[in-house]
């Protein structure tokens, strides 16, 4: 295997392992949070669109924090950005654990916003950093590999949700307090990791190095026209932001409402609410398998072709989910989980390609696009409240259509 085809190089192996651990940490948080919609619907008698403010608070933090986080890292570096993100993550977890006794949805959302600010800061740092820890040619494979551990953590997150759902025989306030132990443990683990990062050396990739692709032949790279054009004049970047918005919107809606889908009274087969997190874990397991297999496939097939095929299949399968075809609908939904797996990291890598010293700033904008996860779930929940949960799964189809366009044409870097 040539140096250009390697996942990473010897000099960047340990930093890559450390950064990959961060993907695992924020995956646990996301996996657990996606189990909470149905939980709050039951405890506080919320409608589906109201419970979706959980996603609004979490992903709204990404929109608010992405640019400040990017500015912080341009001034102080990736390492301090990672430590800041971990600190906010831990603070949010401790605050949620400490305020559940108030039985207030809005206090919970405020604390979740702080936790989400930490996740946004971590993603703003770790996603672009992982693409630069090795040959430029394997950047998409590298971020997919790192994100596969994120997928593994998403499987574990709903199992934490099982602990929360396990308190079904208690009073409402005691149900909410079932979040204290898992959130406290998460806060302690994240705080410990933050302290470890303060003691470990990490190579700081400068703005100039970001554009040069470590460990590969960079002759002529410095003269790429895309290095000198403003970001707004880079179509592959601008469309990448829109594509990421569409993807995270679709992903968040589908993830958030799977438990509602399998427990909906109009749905066959229908399962008990307390078992909902199991079904979400199955979906996340397929998501992780998709990430790992996608990283391997992209060693032989262009990432854009894989993205095009997967988005086209999602467009074809979502109507099967929506038409209430029993087990076929549930299986189709699980296949969509598998297909979505490679989209975020692939769009991210395509969106920041050949941006040189503007990579950190560009990464901030792409992370801001995660706000799609705040805006779309209330719409999907509103449709589901009016009709049925199954009908709500028609809503993501236009989003995958744009991703298909981006994979076929919109990703191309213009000279």
Where are these regions (language model features)?
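Extracytoplasmic
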Residues: 14-42, 126-127, 157, 254-262
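Central cavity-lining transmembrane alpha-helices of secondary-active solute carriers
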Residues: 53-71, 281-293, 372
């Amino acid at each position: 295997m040539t140096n250009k085809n390697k996942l990473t190089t010897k000099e960047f192996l340990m930093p890559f392992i450390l950064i990959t651990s961060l993907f695992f940490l924020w995956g646990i948080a996301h996996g657990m949070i996606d189990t909470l919609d149905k939980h709050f619907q039951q405890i506080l008698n919320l409608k589906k669109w109201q419970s979706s403010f959980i996603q609004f608070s979490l992903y709204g933090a990404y929109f608010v924090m992405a640019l400040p986080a990017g500015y912080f890292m341009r001034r102080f570096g990736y390492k301090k950005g990672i430590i800041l993100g971990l600190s906010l993550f831990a603070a949010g977890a401790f605050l949620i654990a400490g305020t559940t006794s108030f039985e207030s949805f809005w206090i919970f959302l405020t604390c979740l916003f702080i936790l989400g600010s930490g996740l946004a800061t971590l993603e703003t740092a770790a996603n672009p950093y992982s693409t630069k820890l090795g040959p430029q040619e394997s950047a998409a494979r590298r971020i997919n590999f790192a994100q596969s551990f994120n997928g593994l953590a998403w499987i574990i997150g709903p199992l934490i949700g099982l602990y929360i759902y396990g308190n079904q025989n208690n009073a409402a306030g005691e149900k909410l307090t079932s979040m204290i132990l898992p959130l406290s443990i998460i806060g302690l683990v994240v705080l410990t990791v933050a302290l470890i990062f303060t003691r470990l050396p990490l190579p700081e990739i400068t703005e100039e190095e970001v554009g040069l692709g470590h460990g590969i032949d960079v002759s002529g790279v410095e003269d790429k026209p895309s290095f000198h054009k403003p970001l707004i004049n880079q179509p592959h970047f601008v469309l990448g932001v829109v594509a990421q918005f569409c993807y995270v919107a679709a992903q968040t809606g589908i993830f958030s409402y799977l438990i509602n889908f399998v427990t909906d009274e109009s749905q066959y087969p229908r399962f008990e609410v307390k078992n909902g997190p199991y079904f979400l874990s199955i979906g996340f397991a397929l998501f992780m398998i998709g990430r790992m297999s996608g990283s391997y496939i992209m060693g032989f097939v262009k990432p854009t072709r894989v993205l095009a095929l997967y988005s086209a299949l999602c467009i074809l399968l979502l109507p099967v989910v929506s038409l209430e075809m029993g087990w076929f609908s549930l299986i189709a939904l699980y296949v969509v989980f598998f297909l979505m797996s490679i989209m975020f990291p692939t769009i991210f890598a395509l969106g920041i390609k050949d941006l040189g010293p503007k990579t950190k700033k560009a990464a901030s904008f792409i992370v801001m696009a995660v706000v799609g996860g705040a805006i779309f779930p209330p719409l999907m929940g509103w449709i589901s409240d009016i009709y049925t949960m199954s009908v709500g799964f028609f809503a993501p189809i236009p989003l995958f259509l744009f991703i298909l366009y981006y994979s076929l044409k919109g990703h191309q870097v213009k000279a």
